[in-house]
């Protein structure tokens, strides 16, 4: 067990003939006791300071660990968001490409259909024109026919006179 200042103060020595001067020994022990008290007080203060610093180090270590975990969680979340964004972007691009292909195919189909309708209308137009031309020519032939002249020479009064 370590010495205490009281152990030093209360220490008694046996007296012998030609021993140490008692006053000198007591003065020395008193000085040793004071110095020892100072050392013990400083030791206690330093131990308290060490404990306080250990607690602070522990606290900061906990904060550091918490921050590191938070950083890892944030990084993982950022990676998840990035991966999900990339997947979503790929899906959007794929969907846009499908829509573009569909629109192009529909446009091509419509343009082919319109081209076929135009060709059909051209054929119908030629047929109509030919028939119309034939009709007009037939009408012109009727106009050029001498029967018109014969009708003009026909007299209506003569028809009524004959019947009477």
UniProtKB/Swiss-Prot annotation:
One example GO MF annotation: identical protein binding
Protein's cellular compartments: Cytoplasm
Keyword check for Coiled coil: yes
Main location: cytoplasm
Protein origin, superkingdom: Bacteria
Consequences of knocking out this gene: Misplacement of the septum during cell division, resulting in the formation of small, circular, anucleate minicells.
Misc note: Overexpression of DivIVA is lethal.
Name listed for the protein in its UniProt record: Septum site-determining protein DivIVA
């Amino acid at each position: 067990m370590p010495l205490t200042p009281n152990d030093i103060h209360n220490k008694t020595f046996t007296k012998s003939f030609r021993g140490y001067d008692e006053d000198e020994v007591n003065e020395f022990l008193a000085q040793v006791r004071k110095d020892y008290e100072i050392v013990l007080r400083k030791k206690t203060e330093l131990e308290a300071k060490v404990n306080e610093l250990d607690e602070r180090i522990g606290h900061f270590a906990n904060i550091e660990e918490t921050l590191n975990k938070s950083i890892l969680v944030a990084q993982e979340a950022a990676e998840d968001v990035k991966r999900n964004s990339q997947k979503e972007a790929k899906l959007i691009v794929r969907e846009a490409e499908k829509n573009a292909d569909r629109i192009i195919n529909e446009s091509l189909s419509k343009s082919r259909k319109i081209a076929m309708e135009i060709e059909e209308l051209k054929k119908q137009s030629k047929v109509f024109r030919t028939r119309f031309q034939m009709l007009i020519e037939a009408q012109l032939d009727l106009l050029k026919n001498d029967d018109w002249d014969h009708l003009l020479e026909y007299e209506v009064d003569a028809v009524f006179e004959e019947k009477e």
